[in-house]
Design a protein with these regions (language model features):
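N-terminal charged/capping segments associated with class I S-adenosyl-L-methionine
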Residues: 2, 9-55, 72, 78-178, ...
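Rossmann-like AdoMet/SAM-dependent catalytic core
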Residues: 348, 352-602, 606-612, 616, ...
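Conserved SAM-binding motif I beta-strand of class I
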Residues: 206-207, 212-219
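Boundary/linker segments of alpha-helical solenoid repeat arrays
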Residues: 606-610, 636-649, 659-660, 677
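A mobile, often basic/glycine-rich helix-loop segment
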Residues: 278-341, 411, 415
Length: 724
C-alpha cells in the first residue's frame, strides 16, 4: 500500500477511536487528514505533504459545531469537488476546522469574499515564505514543474503561433517585434526554465522567430525575484535577452517594468498578441461566492476567523492552519458588479447564464467566481489591444455540472490554501468578449488545463444569445479558425497531458512493487528525461543497471546527459548530480562519475560520502594516491565513517606504506585492481542497506544478447557499502 494511503488509514483510525469514545477530533487532526486526502487525490506528492511542519505533540480536543468535518464532498472516483459536502448557512467549516467549544477569534466580520481578509493571508504566506514554499515542499509543485508540462505548453503555444502566421482570426504577427510570454505567479522559476528551454529547442520548426520571443517571469515577492536573478541556470537566458523578470502584482498592478531590458509594458505597448501562462495561480487569487436558489442569485459573505482565541498578528501565515470561516448568503441586485472597467456586462452575462442553467434542474447551484483572475487577465490584455493567448493549469472545474447543489465553498489547506478554479467562468468571459476557450473534458484530473484566446474582435458579442448552448456554439465556431492550436491542444493536453503524466509516474512509483528498468526508461523518455523522475526512480536504475542488456544501458547513457541539462536547482535534498555520479560508477565510467561528484560538491555542498565515492572511483582507475586523498577527506569530515577507514587501510597496504604512530603514511605503487561494487548513497532507501549479488536476468524471448556480458551482473559491490 502506498505510504500516503497508509498514513490516511492510520490517521482515520485515530479519528474513529476518538469518535467511539465520544471525543471530537481537533482542528489539527482535521487539517492533517485533509492534507493527506489531497495527497491521495494526487494533488500532493508524499514528499511534499511530508515536508511541512510536523503535527503538534499535544492535541487539544475541541468540539466543533454539529460535529461536522472540514472535508469536501467526493464522488465515487475520489475526485475532490469544489465545495464542502454539506449545506451550512451562517456557520461553516471553510478551512482547517472550526471550534465551538472554545472562543473563536474573529479576524473579520461578514464581507464580500473577494474583499475579505482571506486573500491578505494568502499574500502574506507567499511574501514571508518566498521560495521555501516550493523548495521545502510546503506547496505542491511537481505536477506543474516538470519537463513534460513545459514541452506540452510550448507545443500548444507553437500551434497558436502557426495559426496566427496564417492570419487566423485576424491575429497577424509582426516578426520584427517582440512576442512577450508573461508567466504570472512564477514562484520558483522551475516551470519557466522548462517552457523556455522547450521553445528554444523548437527554433527550426517554429513559425515565429524564436529569437524575438521574450519570456517574462513575474511575481509579487522580492525574495522570488532575487532567487531567479541569482540562479545559475537562468543566467544564459537572461544574458541573451530571451528571458526577463519583473516584480508584478497580478491583482493590483497595471504595468510591468522589465528589469533587464528596462522596457515598460502597459496598455497598447505590444504589437504582437500577449501570451500569458498561469499555473497554480488562479486558485490563489480572490474569488466571489454565489448561489443560485429558486431562480435567484445570492452572494456568499465570509467571516474569516481562527480556532485560536487570540491572533496578535492577523497576517501570520500560520493562521491558515487554524482557519475557522463562517458563511452567510443574501440576495443581490442585477447590477452586482458596477466598477469593472467595462466588464460589467460580461460578468452579468456569466451570472445570468448560471441562473438560466440552474433553472433547468433542481437543488440550485453553488459557484466560485474567479473575479481576481478575470481582472488580472483584463489588464494584461490591454497591453496588446485585447489580442491574447492564455494557457493555465490548476485544480478546478470546467463542467458546470460540478456546481450543482447548495453548499459552502471548500478551502483546501496545504501549507497555504487554495480553492477550485472555475475554468468554465473564465471560458465564458472570453467567449462573451469575442474569443473562445479550449477545455480538457477529462473529469478525473488533479490538474485541469485550459487555453483561452481573445482576437480583439468583439463583433457579435451583442447578438443576444448567451444562455443554454449558445456559448458552446460560439466557442466551436471561433476555435475552428485555429486548427493548429486545436490539434496541438488535443494532442498535448486531451489525449495525454500533464495530468496523465503525473498520474502515470505516481502510480508506477507507488503501485508497482518493483518497476522494471525498461519501464522506467520508457517513463523517462516520455517525460523528456525529467530530473525529478530520475531521482524518484534512482534506486530502480542503480539496482538493475548492472544486469541490464547492453541496448538498455545504451538507452540510459544517451538519456542521462539530458537529465542533467534539464536540472534546475531548487531542493538541495535532491542531489541529482550525486545520483548521476553513482549511475556512472555502476557502469564503470569512472571519469564521468567523478565529474558529477565534483558538480555535487560545488552545487549542493561537500559531503563525506561524496569524497568516499570519489575515492572508490580513483581506486578503480588505479590512482591510489588520489584515492587515498579522497578517503582522508571523507574521514576529515566524518572521523567515524568506518567504510572510509577500511578503504584507507586497504589503499595504504597496497601502497606498501609503513605505519607512523599507528597510521599509514603515503608511498608505494598503485594497484590496478578495480574497486568492486557500487558507491554509497547518502540516504537509506531500505531497512537493509547491504548489497546482495543480483540474479542474472533472462533475456526476453526472441532477443539475442549483444555481447557475452548481456544479462549478466557486474561484479558485486563490497559488503561494507550501503547508503548515505
Amino acid at each position: 500500500m502506498a505510504t500516503s494511503q497508509v498514513a490516511v488509514r492510520e490517521a482515520s483510525c485515530v479519528q474513529q477511536n476518538a469518535a467511539d469514545n465520544g471525543v471530537q477530533e481537533s482542528p489539527e487532526v482535521i487539517a492533517m487528514l485533509a492534507k493527506l486526502e489531497d495527497a491521495l487525490d494526487g494533488n500532493l506528492e508524499p514528499s511534499e505533504w511530508g515536508g511541512s511542519s510536523p503535527p503538534p505533540r499535544h492535541v487539544q480536543h475541541q468540539q466543533r459545531p454539529g460535529g461536522h468535518t472540514a472535508f469536501d464532498a467526493r464522488n465515487n472516483s475520489g475526485e475532490s469537488g469544489g465545495w464542502d459536502g454539506r449545506q451550512q448557512h451562517k456557520r461553516g467549516a471553510g478551512g482547517a476546522g472550526t471550534g465551538a467549544g472554545n472562543e473563536r477569534c474573529v479576524l473579520e466580520d461578514f464581507t464580500q469574499c473577494s474583499k475579505s481578509h482571506l486573500w491578505k493571508l494568502m499574500m502574506s504566506f507567499y511574501d514571508r515564505k518566498g521560495v521555501e514554499s516550493w523548495s521545502q515542499g510546503i506547496v505542491p509543485h511537481f505536477i506543474t514543474c516538470n519537463a513534460f508540462i513545459g514541452r506540452s505548453y510550448a507545443q500548444v503555444l507553437s500551434g497558436f503561433l502557426r495559426d496566427c502566421v496564417r492570419g487566423a482570426g485576424g491575429m497577424k504577427l509582426d516578426p520584427t517585434e517582440p512576442l512577450y510570454i508573461i508567466e504570472l505567479g512564477t514562484g520558483s522559476g522551475k516551470f519557466s526554465f522548462f517552457m523556455l528551454k522547450a521553445l528554444l529547442e523548437m527554433k527550426e520548426v517554429c513559425d515565429f522567430p524564436v529569437e524575438k520571443m521574450v519570456y517574462v517571469m513575474t511575481d509579487f515577492t522580492e525574495s522570488n525575484f532575487k532567487f531567479w536573478a541569482e540562479h545559475p541556470v537562468l543566467k544564459p537566458f537572461l544574458d541573451s535577452g530571451q528571458l526577463d523578470m519583473a516584480i508584478f502584482d497580478a491583482v493590483n498592478d497595471t504595468t510591468i517594468k522589465l528589469s533587464r531590458s528596462g522596457v515598460l509594458l502597459g496598455p497598447g505597448t505590444c504589437v504582437n498578441p500577449i501570451c500569458v501562462v498561469a499555473n497554480y495561480l488562479f486558485d490563489t487569487l480572490c474569488h466571489d461566492i454565489f448561489q443560485v436558489d429558486q431562480g435567484k442569485a445570492k452572494e456568499g459573505l465570509i467571516s474569516v476567523g481562527s480556532t485560536q482565541k487570540d491572533e496578535p498578528d492577523p497576517l501570520d501565515p500560520e493562521i491558515i492552519q487554524r482557519l475557522d470561516n463562517r458563511f452567510s448568503y443574501q440576495d443581490i441586485p442585477d447590477d452586482y458588479y458596477t466598477d469593472e472597467d467595462g466588464d460589467e456586462p460580461h460578468f452579468k452575462r456569466i451570472l445570468d447564464w448560471y441562473v438560466d442553467y440552474a433553472a433547468q434542474g433542481s437543488g440550485g447551484m453553488s459557484i466560485l467566481f474567479p473575479v481576481g483572475a478575470l481582472r488580472a487577465l483584463r489588464r494584461l490584455m490591454t497591453f496588446s489591444d485585447n489580442r491574447a493567448f492564455v494557457i493555465s493549469g490548476d485544480k478546478g472545474n470546467n463542467n458546470p455540472e460540478q456546481f450543482k447543489g447548495l453548499m459552502d465553498p471548500h478551502i483546501a489547506v496545504h501549507g497555504s490554501f487554495s480553492v477550485m478554479v472555475n475554468y468554465h467562468s473564465i471560458g465564458a468571459y472570453f467567449t462573451s468578449r469575442g474569443g473562445f476557450a479550449l477545455h480538457n473534458p477529462q473529469e478525473e484530473a488533479s490538474l485541469k488545463v485550459s487555453t483561452f484566446v481573445l482576437t480583439g474582435d468583439s463583433g457579435g458579442d451583442e447578438d443576444g444569445e448567451w444562455t443554454g448552448e449558445a456559448m458552446d456554439r460560439k466557442d466551436l465556431e471561433r476555435s475552428s479558425q485555429f486548427p493548429h492550436l486545436e490539434a496541438a491542444f488535443r494532442t498535448n493536453v486531451e489525449q495525454f497531458g500533464p495530468n496523465d503524466f503525473f498520474v502515470m509516474q505516481k502510480c508506477m512509483k507507488e503501485d508497482a512493487a518493483t518497476p522494471t528498468l525498461k519501464s522506467v526508461v520508457a517513463l523517462l523518455k516520455l517525460g523528456d528525461w525529467d530530473p525529478d523522475v530520475f531521482y524518484k526512480f534512482r534506486d530502480t536504475i542503480l539496482n538493475q543497471v548492472s544486469t541490464a542488456v547492453t541496448k538498455l544501458k545504451k538507452d540510459l547513457c544517451r538519456g542521462i546527459p539530458r537529465v542533467w541539462s534539464n536540472y534546475y536547482m531548487l531542493d538541495k535534498d535532491k542531489d541529482v548530480a550525486f545520483e548521476i555520479g553513482r549511475f556512472y560508477y555502476g557502469i564503470r565510467e569512472y571519469e564521468n562519475a567523478l565529474e558529477f561528484y565534483r558538480d555535487s560538491s560545488e552545487s549542493v555542498g561537500q559531503h563525506h560520502v561524496t569524497f568516499h565515492n570519489m575515492g572508490l572511483c580513483y581506486y578503480s582507475m588505479g590512482d591510489l594516491h588520489q584515492a587515498k586523498i579522497n578517503f582522508e577527506l571523507a574521514l576529515g569530515m566524518n572521523p567515524n565513517y568506518e567504510k572510509a577507514k577500511s578503504w584507507q587501510r586497504k589503499v595504504h597496504q597496497e601502497l606498501n606504506c609503513p605505519e607512523v604512530n599507528g597510521e599509514p603514511s603515503a608511498n608505494g605503487t598503485a594497484s590496478t585492481t578495480p574497486a568492486t561494487g557500487i558507491t554509497d548513497a547518502r540516504v537509506p532507501t531500505s531497512p537493509s542497506a547491504e548489497w546482495t549479488v543480483p540474479t542474472p536476468l533472462a533475456l526476453p524471448a526472441g532477443e539475442e544478447a549483444d555481447s557475452p556480458a548481456d544479462g549478466l551482473p557486474l561484479e558485486p559491490p563490497a559488503e561494507d557499502l550501503n547508503t548515505r
